A protein has these predicted regions:
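Active-site recognition of the HExxH zinc-binding catalytic motif
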Residues: 310-327
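Short pre-active-site segment immediately N-terminal to the catalytic Zn-binding motif
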Residues: 196, 293-314
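Fold-level signature of zinc-dependent metallopeptidase catalytic domains
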Residues: 155-212, 225-235
Length: 452
């Protein structure tokens, strides 16, 4: 008994020591404020350049305080902070960008464009070297910039210390020092429409927390709604000749895709948020037209007044928060985003190159890999109609979720060679009501990474 008590004491002491070390590491290297770095990414389909635009300091730091030199997901790019003149990493984070997506389109073959990007890191106490890397779909670094930041630089702008955009706290985390900070941002709402915006934000919040693992980990999230007013109501629709004056300049037809609703004005987005408690961003656009988008550690953007608003805002948060991939495929158009001889970094798709490090441990023994679709093996990997999906869900009601985890062909916009964990999922369709078991695990692991 004494031995057990001693062991328990040692475990507790060890845990306290680990937490204390993490706190000391942050305190030694960083202040409780945010360094916002504005970058310009420029290039075409085959070249890319990175340039620093502005340095800004904002009050408080709302990101991670532990695991500072670790990445929970690889992303399509990474930002790394090192002690000046050394190789010692004191902070890392990953991201994806619209610029990198644009490089995959035909327009990029004949044109050069620039894109705004904004990254947040904790404010260093001493001079640091910051490296931004861009990676291709083979995980190769194809663009890189290293620059030095001296925290005493008099040209670092101080923003967010006054005239903060009004915001409403929708949910306070149990421990605001170890939580995930989400900010909803109003886009296309006039001053008289702010009550509608706050209600739309509440709807999105309840939709998110209807899904596991968010529902059981709800108290780890701090959520605010930022009342950024626009001159005009709605959003721009270029293909219809409609242009509106909104705070973020959002629009449909991004990359000439009708339903792709985004904003390219990331500096304006972060200007609106200066002084607000935030790390993860959900932009709510005041429109009933279907559309949205989500970019890892950049933002999630969704329409609000379409019947499928709840499903879309949650789906896009899967992209922006956790880097989850789309699990659907197009029958009419194949988009070669994922080489079949390279394992994707996204946690919820695989090419089977390194399946052992994905969700293989969730599959029941004896399950065939690749896995035929339940009830209809001839249609594996194809996008089902809503009616077909509903019928199959009814037939499978008696089965456990784990019994259907496998490797189903058809994901990441490709019918062949890319596999998903489950017949259907929130990352695959608007009809399925849950994240699949593999997505749930990825989300749970990420929430723990940020909050434990």
């Amino acid at each position: 008994m004494k031995k057990n008590i001693l062991s328990l004491f040692m475990m507790l002491a060890s845990g306290l020591g680990a937490n204390a070390a993490a706190d000391v590491d942050f305190e030694q290297n960083f202040c409780d404020s945010t360094l916002r770095i504005d970058y310009t990414f420029l290039g075409n389909a085959t070249t890319q350049s990175i340039a620093v635009d502005k340095l800004n300091m904002m009050p408080r730091w709302y990101g991670k305080h532990a695991h500072l030199d670790e990445l929970p997901v690889e992303g399509n790019g990474q930002i790394t902070v090192r002690k000046h003149g050394t190789s010692e990493v004191i902070y890392r984070n990953s991201f994806s960008t619209l610029f990198q997506e644009w490089q995959s389109y035909d327009e990029a073959k004949n044109n050069v464009k620039s894109f705004e990007n904004v990254f947040l890191v904790p404010m260093p106490r001493d001079t640091v070297d910051i490296t931004v890397d861009l990676r291709n779909n083979r995980h190769e670094v194809v663009g890189s910039l290293t620059h030095t930041v001296a925290p005493k630089d008099v040209l670092i702008r101080h923003i967010g210390f006054g005239n903060t955009t009004p915001y409403v706290t929708l949910q306070q985390a149990k421990d605001t020092t170890k939580c995930i900070h989400i900010a909803y941002v109003a886009e296309g709402y006039q001053p008289g429409e702010m009550a509608t915006f706050v209600e739309d934000a509440k709807i999105a919040t309840e939709a998110l927390f209807e899904h596991e693992p968010f529902s059981s980990m709800r108290d780890r999230f701090n959520i605010v709604a930022v009342e950024s007013a626009s001159v005009d109501s709605g959003t721009s629709e270029p293909s219809k000749g409609v242009w509106r004056n909104t705070v973020l300049g959002s629009h449909f037809d991004t990359f000439y895709s009708n339903r792709y609703l985004t904003t390219l004005n990331l500096k304006s987005l972060h200007d609106v948020l200066a002084g607000v408690p935030y790390e993860h961003i959900i932009v709510l656009v005041n429109t009933s037209e279907y559309g949205g988008g989500g970019i890892l550690n950049s933002y999630n953007l969704s329409m609000t007044h379409h019947p499928q608003y709840r499903q879309v805002v949650v789906h896009e948060f899967g992209h922006s928060f956790a880097g989850l991939a789309d699990e659907y495929a197009y029958e009419a158009e194949q988009i070669p985003m994922y080489p079949h001889d390279v394992e994707p970094w996204e946690k919820n798709i695989t090419t089977l190159v390194d399946f052992h490090n994905k969700w293989e441990n969730l599959i029941e023994p004896g399950t065939q890999v690749p896995t035929p679709m339940p009830e209809d093996k001839s249609e594996k990997g194809k996008v089902k109609s809503e009616k077909s999906s509903k019928v199959k869900r009814e037939k499978r009601k008696g089965k456990s979720e784990k019994s259907e985890v496998g490797a189903y062909e058809g994901a990441g916009y490709s019918l062949k060679g890319v596999y998903r964990p489950y017949p259907d999922c929130r990352m695959r369709s608007n009809q399925h009501k849950d994240f699949c078991p593999a997505c749930q695990k990825a989300l749970r692991d990420l929430i723990n990474f940020y909050t434990e």
